[in-house]
């Protein structure tokens, strides 16, 4: 299963913010530049993560963004489920658009559903804090430490 760039950027933004001092504000432009990703796309991601209560956005001249929750309170599986617009691996997962003639007897759908459930279950075992065990290396790569 491949995550969308939207989810990828969401996770990267959360990781970046988790590496910052608790009260430090970052800018979307700064994060987009560091990751070499679209500012406009990251702005949409930022807006959505704010609506989900994962990041805090402060408007104004001295505004910026920061985590709204502690890293240990942000579950990776939950973020993926909230930011992926479609977790249907195959057409038959959607009863409204399914046109596969094998559907009544197909066993593949069950196997794929089991695989998706296992995939999400693994992601749900981790929090943002779990991704920070190599904090020094991450900060060096993101040029957060001199």
Curated annotation (Swiss-Prot):
Its cofactor is [2Fe-2S] cluster. It holds the Pfam family Rrf2. Residues 2-133 form the HTH rrf2-type domain. Binds 1 [2Fe-2S] cluster per subunit. One of its GO terms (cellular component) is cytosol. Residues 28-51 bind DNA. [2Fe-2S] cluster binds at residues 92, 100, 106. The keyword RNA-binding does not apply. One of its GO terms (molecular function) is DNA-binding transcription factor activity. InterPro entries: TR_Rrf2-type_CS (IPR030489), Tscrpt_reg_Rrf2 (IPR000944), WH-like_DNA-bd_sf (IPR036388), WH_DNA-bd_sf (IPR036390). Keywords: 2Fe-2S, DNA-binding, Iron, Iron-sulfur, Metal-binding, Transcription, Transcription regulation. NCBIfam families: rrf2_super. Nitric oxide-responsive transcriptional regulator. This is HTH-type transcriptional regulator NsrR. It comes from Halalkalibacterium halodurans (strain ATCC BAA-125 / DSM 18197 / FERM 7344 / JCM 9153 / C-125).
């Amino acid at each position: 299963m491949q995550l969308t760039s939207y989810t990828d950027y969401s996770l990267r933004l959360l990781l970046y913010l988790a590496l910052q001092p608790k009260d430090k504000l970052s800018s979307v432009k700064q994060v987009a530049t560091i990751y070499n990703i679209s500012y406009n796309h990251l702005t949409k991601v930022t807006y959505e993560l704010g609506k989900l209560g994962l990041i805090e956005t402060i408007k104004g001249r001295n505004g910026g963004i920061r985590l709204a929750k502690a890293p240990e309170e942000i579950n990776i599986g939950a973020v993926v489920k909230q930011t992926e617009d479609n977790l249907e691996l195959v057409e038959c997962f959607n009863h409204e658009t399914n046109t596969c003639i094998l559907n009544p007897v197909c066993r593949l759908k069950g196997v794929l559903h089991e695989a998706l459930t296992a995939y999400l279950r693994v992601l749900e075992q981790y929090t943002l804090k779990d991704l920070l065990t190599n904090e020094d290396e991450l900060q060096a790569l993101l040029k957060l430490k001199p």
